[in-house]
Amino acid sequence: MLRLTNIRSSDGRIIPDIEADDGSDNYSERDMSAFTAVPGYFDSHIHGSFGFDVSDGNADDVIRLAKSLPSFGVSGFLPTLMTLDEDHILKAAGAVAEAISRLKDFDGAYAEIAGLRLEGPFLNPLFSGVQNPDCLVDSDRFVEIIEKAEKEYPGLIKMIDIAPELDGAMDIVSKFKDRYVISLGHSDSDYENAAEFFANGGNSLTHALNAMRPCLKREPGPLGAAFDAPDSYVEVICDGIHVDQSMLRMLFKLFEDRVIVVSDAMRAGGMPDGIYDLGGIDVESRGGRTYFGPGGNLAGSVTNPSQEAERLFSYGIPANQVIKALTDTPRKRLNIENKDLSGGAKPCLNFVDDTLRLKSVISRGRLVSPYLML
């Protein structure tokens, strides 16, 4: 057993000593005054990592993913499905529901599963990216799939991504806005259409500046509409590849506490370079990038929240803003209370140094070694 002492949070609060299970029969103390305690990170857009993919529909793999993510400093996540056909969506939903149920009886370290996110299949084929175009559906079919999944697994779905310029999209927003977080993604929407989406109940932008119309001086597109919608959130992949660091600084300046950092990681995260499957499509992971197709288009990422935190701080973004975008804001979007620094019998918190490098992780009262392959 390990007793952690002299713990201070990023807002200067002194946190009572914490006892953590370090796997040892001996009792020891560790002075944490050289580090800052921050809440566990929450990844609200992640397909997989460590060789596991939620879209495979395997409950054992979802559980293995949940047990592995604390090494990235993640205490909660929203498993995200690729664009799949109905049978595979329902199979994957069942696997996530089973994983949630089975983890309730597990006493070790794991990242809590917040529900399920559907990235598709109601997306624009012009901006489908690595999403399988053969599985895209119209609005009526999308509603049928949602309703069937809701009937079989009530309350599991928490978030859906749609392209609001497609026929029937606004009806979907009206129908589901009180049930799910609805995010604009993989879309050819212009400013006016995106503004209507936000005005009618949509409240989020999926991986900003990727798989959508660009933000131009006379055509501000979805990003401009999100800026003008004060209750909306903007998620961004901060791997230094999907969005340039200067643009990241701009986004944090413009959107302030509305920024949500996501990984959009696929199964190659935390794994060696190689060829990996993503929603039925072969993707090459090489040198921290993921590619697919003859044009070498980006296909998700292999980053993780601990890498993103350190990277954003190195770009000049204030530490408190980085931490909030990784902890409080993604939970707020899903209406989840952040209790990670409130103590309790099974605390979850990260210890970071002055560069936001992850140094120690406490996951549900267990000491976890950080994954530091940067």
Which residues does each PLM region occupy?
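Active-site-adjacent C-terminal substructures of enzyme catalytic domains
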Residues: 172, 193-326, 333-337, 351-357
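Divalent metal-dependent hydrolysis catalytic cores, especially in the metallo-beta-lactamase
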Residues: 47, 63-92, 110-124, 153-167, ...
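Divalent metal-coordination and catalytic microenvironments
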Residues: 7, 34, 45, 69, ...
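Charged helix-capping and loop-helix junction motifs
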Residues: 58-61, 92-95, 218-223
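Active-site mouth loops of central-metabolism enzymes
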Residues: 48-60, 81, 131-137, 181-185
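Divalent metal-binding pocket/active-site signature
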Residues: 118-120, 125-221
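Acidic, glycine-enriched loop/beta-strand segments at the rims
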Residues: 9-17, 318-323, 332-364, 370-371
